[in-house]
């Protein structure tokens, strides 16, 4: 028998479940280009779609790894048997995914690449992928003993209002180096896409679209109208005109 739960508790429970699931998958699939998760609840089962840049590594050999993740999620969150399914979806354009770029920058720094070179490489790749703007912030003990932050920007970036929720994709990651922990923040501003595939459908509120003027339409002269026909009303017949119409006197 299903237990009754208030709407407020339901929203909180769903948020906690999503946050914990996202944390587990972030730690487990960090090296496989994990870029987010989507949860779809149907009457029959719960579908969990994992977005990653390397889906083959997420699936594993003959689907072994995805089955292990399914068993882990099922036991951790107490799902009934065969009521949860995990799927792997490939990210179409990883240059427009902030999570994928933050993970890429993280592994570049772990590999010993200089901070400036790594950040400029990420900026260039994001802008070549069709983004409208990009911002990368790296903070921590970069060179000297004193911590500082370095900001790298390119293109156009909005920072307030409703467009930040629709156009900005942001991600934060941390990397542990020999000198300490560095913080990485990547913000990508997507471009407007009427189809909704590579960007939001709604245009920016300050965008003005000037339509091209229409061509002047040349109207031809109307055809010559025929002369109007005048109707002449005849006078009524009288006995003066026709005497035979006079009735005989009895």
Swiss-Prot record:
PROSITE patterns: KH_TYPE_2. InterPro entries: KH_dom-like_a/b (IPR015946), KH_dom_type_2 (IPR004044), KH_sf_prok-type (IPR009019), Ribosomal_S3_C_sf (IPR036419), Ribosomal_uS3_C (IPR001351), Ribosomal_uS3_euk/arc (IPR005703). It holds the Pfam family KH_2. The keyword RNA-binding applies. GO terms for cellular component: chloroplast; cytosolic ribosome; cytosolic small ribosomal subunit; peroxisome; plant-type vacuole; plasmodesma. One of its GO terms (biological process) is translation. Residues 21-92 form the KH type-2 domain. Belongs to the universal ribosomal protein uS3 family. This is Small ribosomal subunit protein uS3z. It comes from Arabidopsis thaliana (Mouse-ear cress). The gene is RPS3A.
């Amino acid at each position: 028998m299903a237990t009754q739960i208030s709407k407020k508790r339901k929203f909180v429970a769903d948020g906690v479940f999503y946050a914990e699931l996202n944390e587990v998958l972030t730690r487990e699939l960090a090296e496989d280009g994990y870029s987010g998760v989507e949860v779809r609840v149907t009457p029959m089962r719960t579908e969990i779609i994992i977005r990653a840049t390397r889906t083959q590594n997420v699936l594993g050999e003959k689907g072994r790894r995805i089955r292990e993740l399914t068993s882990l999620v099922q036991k951790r969150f107490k799902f009934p048997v065969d009521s949860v399914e995990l799927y792997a979806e490939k990210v179409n354009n990883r240059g427009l995914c902030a999570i994928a770029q933050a993970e890429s920058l993280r592994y570049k720094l772990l590999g010993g690449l200089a901070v400036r070179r790594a950040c400029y490489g990420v900026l260039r790749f994001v802008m070549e992928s069709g983004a409208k703007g990009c911002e990368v912030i790296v903070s921590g003990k970069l060179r000297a003993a004193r911590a500082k932050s370095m900001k790298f920007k390119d293109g156009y970036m909005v920072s307030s209002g409703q467009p930040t929720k629709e156009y900005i994709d942001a991600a934060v990651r941390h990397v542990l180096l020999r000198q300490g922990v560095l913080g990485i923040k990547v913000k990508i501003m997507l471009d407007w896409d009427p189809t909704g595939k590579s960007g939001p459908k709604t245009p920016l509120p300050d965008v003005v679209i000037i339509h091209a003027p229409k061509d002047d339409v040349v109207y031809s002269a109307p055809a010559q109208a025929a002369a109007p026909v005048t109707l002449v009303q005849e006078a009524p017949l009288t006995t003066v005109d026709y005497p035979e119409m006079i009735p005989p006197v009895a």
